[in-house]
């Protein structure tokens, strides 16, 4: 059950953007606040909030920032209605792209996303044009270390409901169904494991290798999308060239 999921390839580009712009805590904080607003501030009674808090912890978001985000739900977000919207389209050279937005203004979001696509050699498509190329899965990423036995971790993950276990150079990747993600994550947490990533996301069925020229265009498109305050996540099926840097 080992394989190459391209996690480092994609995560390196995403982390680079998030670190450069300092946006990640703001985006996750928004998710926490809205999850608390919709389902209540108690994580024990709100599975969605539990999942987002796990995502926050995996990204090293401070505890006080998480608590402030929950309190926002009863304050400044009390009268604001946010919608989750999924945009689909193609990046340069036909890269399949999904953009997950959380917005209080659909017209603003649609305009910004459409502009990001068209300006960088892509085009925004209709619903369903690329989503069939992706599967929604829970993904838990754990950094390798000398104290972790790969065989034991794999058996533990599969026994508590994981669908797949992969080993990359520096990480283990545990994949679950969306429905089992919470229970698998909580079981592993109870065993004292810490995560580099823990969230439900869209994972492409296959990846498309792109050249350096396309990579440069596409990275600029990703920069613009991930800098948008309404955009929460961007998923794609591009595999950047080995060792490529912007």
From Swiss-Prot:
<keyword id="KW-0804">Transcription</keyword>
<keyword id="KW-0963">Cytoplasm</keyword>
<dbReference type="InterPro" id="IPR049083">
    <property type="entry name" value="TACO1_YebC_N"/>
</dbReference>
<dbReference type="InterPro" id="IPR017856">
    <property type="entry name" value="Integrase-like_N"/>
</dbReference>
<dbReference type="Pfam" id="PF01709">
    <property type="entry name" value="Transcrip_reg"/>
</dbReference>
<dbReference type="GO" id="GO:0003677">
    <property type="term" value="F:DNA binding"/>
</dbReference>
<dbReference type="InterPro" id="IPR026564">
    <property type="entry name" value="Transcrip_reg_TACO1-like_dom3"/>
</dbReference>
<protein>
    <recommendedName>
        <fullName>Probable transcriptional regulatory protein ORF2U</fullName>
    </recommendedName>
</protein>
<dbReference type="InterPro" id="IPR048300">
    <property type="entry name" value="TACO1_YebC-like_2nd/3rd_dom"/>
</dbReference>
<dbReference type="Pfam" id="PF20772">
    <property type="entry name" value="TACO1_YebC_N"/>
</dbReference>
<dbReference type="InterPro" id="IPR029072">
    <property type="entry name" value="YebC-like"/>
</dbReference>
<dbReference type="GO" id="GO:0005829">
    <property type="term" value="C:cytosol"/>
</dbReference>
<keyword id="KW-0805">Transcription regulation</keyword>
<comment type="similarity">
    <text>Belongs to the TACO1 family.</text>
</comment>
<keyword id="KW-0238">DNA-binding</keyword>
<dbReference type="InterPro" id="IPR002876">
    <property type="entry name" value="Transcrip_reg_TACO1-like"/>
</dbReference>
<dbReference type="GO" id="GO:0006355">
    <property type="term" value="P:regulation of DNA-templated transcription"/>
</dbReference>
